[in-house]
Amino acid sequence: MSRFVKNSMLGALAGGATALASFFSSIAVARTLGVNETGSVAYVIWLVWMAVPFVDLGLSSAVGRFLPFLQGSGQYGESAHLDRNLSRRLVIAAFVAAICAGMMVWLYGHRSVAEFLSGGTAKGASTPLVVLMIVLVVGQALTTYTYARLRGRQEFLMAARIAGVSLLLQVSAVIGGSLLFGITGALAGYAAGMLVPSVVCLSAMFGPASIDRTLSRRVTSFALYCWGANVTSAIVWSRIELFFLERYWGMDSVAMFAVALALTQLAIQGPMLLTSAVLASLAEKRGRDDLDGMRGQFAAAVRLLAALVFPICFGTAAIIPELLPALYGDKFIAAVPAAMVLVSVAALSVLSTVATSLVQALERSDFVFASSLCGAACALAAGFLLIPEFGVMGAAFARVAIQMLMIGLGCWFVVQRLGFTIPVVAVLKLCAAALASAAAASVCIRIVGHPSSIPLAIVAGAAVYVVGLRVVNAVEPGDAAFLTNLTRSLPPALAEIAARLAAFVSATKRNERMLPP
């Protein structure tokens, strides 16, 4: 198995554990606390995600970009020093942020701050809620940095182990905390999931940390652009709609939209997590000036992700009418239409992560900042114009439209400015096969009309997708070879089945190559 494939699989395991922790926690909160309290927890978690980019200072992006770059160019000592240097910067930033937050609480009063954080639902236990908010922001900043650092160091096995332990800690703590202490207990459970990666981050800052002045300027410039981009991107990608829904429609609408987003995130996490090794690999190739290798890997990554994310997203949208109530309860059935819209379009946002990795590998974080600024302005405009009038569905369609705009800008930049090619024809073929798959799954759901139809719908959709790949000639010869090599890493029983499937979907391509000119 190639190093890139192994790292991608381990990165997917690590990210999958993180995604499952968030997903299972959201179900636990919904089942134990009810709709209004679920909205309050989702609102606080959104505030945490909004605050973290301010604390991070773009350092997570910098460590994930420059560590593999230095290692790819053979500068291992400089890489180790930079690792410790950036870890210290982040810890100092988090410490300063905690002090500033404490001063703000002292100035405005813990009750006022707690009421704002919970959207007015916190009447008691205001001090624990405020303290938890500060702990969550600092812990999430350290956690995000830790996983970016481990990806940059290409220690994906360690990342997977930490994520697995954190999954168990968070889910068990959220369940227990929700049952015993309500909203504050649930939030304490989320904080428990950040404990291990935070300790790892703190332990990484000890030792020599001096770096070359030229490198320091490059890293600082890159980090500052990423900082601005991450802050503005948070408005577009980190659920800014919750703020407007809370203000105009109340916590019940916040809960509905949060549940819709939770299912969307679950659907895209698997394919998206395979991109965890893309930035490190592209940056490493950039360090060797291997532009042809970068072009080939970019196109292959887009095709591979499209092959995975299209059937998953479209298929999930097809089964959501039965899946969502089965997971969260009938109280959340109003979230079904928004969830179907968000999941259907989420596939394109996953593909855009490959383009973002490419842009960062080429140190063009200035474009990420500029495009994020444009998206943030559109998100704020939609929040004031659409959400007050149309509620949850207005938030869903606004999110989709803005993300499509951002993706369009990114594709234009990759093609016109960077000179890379997007495999449009291959992506369209994969999309067609996935739509046929989703149609088959939807028919099963509509005919049976019961949660028991979900397994049947998944099997039918998968079968139609495999046949569709062969019919539309969607698998490229190079991708077929990649799939064949990948099957050899599986257990023997699974490897034989996977090899037969890979041979089936790529048979038409092979036959075409055997025909005489």
Which positions does each model-derived feature cover?
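Membrane-proximal transmembrane or re-entrant/amphipathic helices at the cytosolic face
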Residues: 442-517
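Interfacial segments at transmembrane-helix termini and the short loops linking adjacent helices
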Residues: 108-132, 299, 316-350
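Helix-loop junctions and terminal segments of transmembrane helices
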Residues: 57-73, 87, 152, 260, ...
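Transmembrane helical elements of multi-pass membrane transporters/channels
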Residues: 7-23, 189-197, 213-284, 304, ...
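Membrane-interface helix-loop junctions in multi-pass transport and translocation proteins
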Residues: 30-37, 154-157, 167-199, 366, ...
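Hydrophobic transmembrane helix module of multi-pass membrane transport proteins
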Residues: 88-235, 442-443
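Signature of the first transmembrane helix
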Residues: 3-69, 98, 102, 136, ...
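Interhelical loop/hinge segments that connect adjacent transmembrane helices in multipass membrane
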Residues: 1-4, 199-238, 277, 281-296, ...
